[in-house]
Design a protein with these regions (language model features):
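Conserved N-terminal beta1-alpha1 strand-loop-helix module at the mouth
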Residues: 1-208
Length: 208
């Protein structure tokens, strides 16, 4: 079954909403974003998070020591990297913490995919390319990019997903997980009904 990640939680109210519907992962954004949270805010939310849900920290070119510290303190269970982090950065992070690493890339063309795959990361995440934006654009990812590519590593798909399109995205690709943020918000706030519907839509999909 395709996994679900709800990204960009910012409050205990958001945690209460996801706890009711149990996505597989949630995301705390530590990068410059309207969804940014501090270390202490993330720790407080993680303490309230259902233990069946994995907390992922989202970073853009963050000093390795800070990321490793959040892993060691139990603030996050996995790391998602959206910057230009090198293979040696990922290798050292994994050696120091034993954490799962998701490497996000923004792809414009199918021929770019093979050379952008990280050998060190556990998973890839493909997101919509938008100049100057490392992620979280809410714009639809062009599925032909992954459909035309041979991706050996399990991957997350992000970019413009919502309950209206996620089932077709899953059927058309071999994604390991789908990642949503804007698609489960109303006026910039996580919407419980949209979260419920999104999780339900994903878990009702039957791949051929």
């Amino acid at each position: 079954m395709t996994k679900v990640k709800i990204c960009g939680l910012r409050s205990l109210a958001d945690v209460e909403k996801v706890n009711r519907y149990l996505p597989d992962y949630i995301g705390f954004v530590f990068a410059d974003s309207r969804r940014f949270v501090t270390d202490e805010q993330a720790l407080e939310m993680n303490r309230a998070l259902d233990r069946r849900i994995q907390a992922v920290g989202v970073f853009v070119d963050e000093p390795l020591g800070h990321v490793a510290g959040l892993c060691d303190r139990g603030v996050i269970n996995a790391v998602q990297l959206h910057g230009g982090e090198s293979e040696s950065y990922i290798r050292e992070l994994k050696q120091n913490t034993g954490t799962t690493v998701i490497k996000a890339v923004r792809v414009q063309r199918a021929e770019q995919v093979s050379r952008m795959i990280s050998q060190e990361a556990d998973y890839m995440l493909f997101d919509t390319y938008k100049k100057g934006a490392p992620g979280g654009t809410g714009e639809r990812f062009p599925l032909e990019i992954v459909k035309e590519s041979f991706v050996r590593k399990p991957y997350f798909l992000a970019g413009g997903l919502d309950c209206g399109n996620v089932a077709e995205v899953i059927r058309q690709t071999e994604c390991f997980a789908v990642d949503v943020s804007t698609g489960v918000e109303t006026d910039g706030v996580k919407d419980e009904e949209k979260i419920r519907r999104f999780v339900e839509c994903v878990r009702n999909v039957k791949r051929v």
